[in-house]
Design a protein with these regions (language model features):
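Membrane-embedded alpha-helical bundles that constitute the cytochrome b-like, heme-associated redox core
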Residues: 1-228
Length: 228
């Protein structure tokens, strides 16, 4: 339908997008979704090529070891790039601030998980629950270590043999741990279609937000506490 003159005025400016008007609330910006998607693909590529290098059956099946090594090295080196580029986004910086803060409600969430308490209200969470914050902290710490040890293995002239041997040990075992943690992260995502839809489209249904992230859902109706 053709807009009438003046339809771009104050009323149009305050009209919410159709998704929000249909009972959905905005969860992630386009920049955040791009960072997540790009980082995920790079990390999956890195893990897949690592498997091809370390599992003999896969190495024999895939072949072309030099190409696999090259793809592994460059995909690993590029993993931090999407996040660094995304820091230009105010929404991403705000979410990083939320991920970096642990509050009393996060400790309550962890206690409820430990007791397997699923009662309503037993697991209060802001925009990110305590599990997501721990996962983000783990990845944020693991990626620089993997990058540093990988560079020592790649450029053999950077350090003596003893250092390179230690770097290889750390790199290999940390890679295995990352693979296990990533598998758990993906399993949780596969079990929650609405969470995946939120990362894909940027918005989620309000009832889901109220059930999974009640403190954040409440804050969407008033000025938000950045600590949540």
């Amino acid at each position: 339908m053709t807009s009438m003159p003046g339809s771009g005025g104050p009323t149009a400016a305050t009209t919410p997008p159709p998704a929000e008007a249909a009972g959905r609330i905005r969860r992630f910006s386009r920049a955040e979704r791009w960072v997540h998607r790009t980082t995920a693909w790079l990390m999956l590529l890195c893990v897949a090529t690592a498997a091809c290098l370390y599992v003999p059956q896969l190495a024999e099946l895939v072949g072309r070891r030099h190409l696999v090594v090259t793809v592994h090295e460059w995909s690993g080196l590029l993993i931090p790039v999407p996040l660094l580029a995304g820091l230009a986004s105010r929404a991403l910086r705000a979410d990083l601030s939320r991920l970096n803060r642990f509050g009393p409600h996060d400790r309550q969430w962890l206690r409820a998980v430990r007791r397997r308490d699923h009662r309503p209200g037993s697991r209060p969470a802001g925009k990110f629950n305590a599990g997501q914050k721990l996962y983000a902290a783990w990845i944020a710490g693991a990626v620089p270590v993997m990058t540093g040890t990988g560079l020592l293995m790649w450029f053999t002239g950077l350090a003596p043999l003893m250092w390179r041997t230690g770097a290889t040990f750390v790199h290999d075992w940390l890679a295995l741990a990352i693979g296990i943690v990533l598998a758990g992260h993906m399993a949780k995502a596969l079990a929650d279609p609405e969470a995946r839809r939120g990362m894909r489209t940027g918005s989620v249904e309000r009832p889901w937000a109220r059930a999974e992230h009640p403190l954040w859902e409440e804050s969407t109706e008033r000025p938000e506490d950045p600590k949540r």
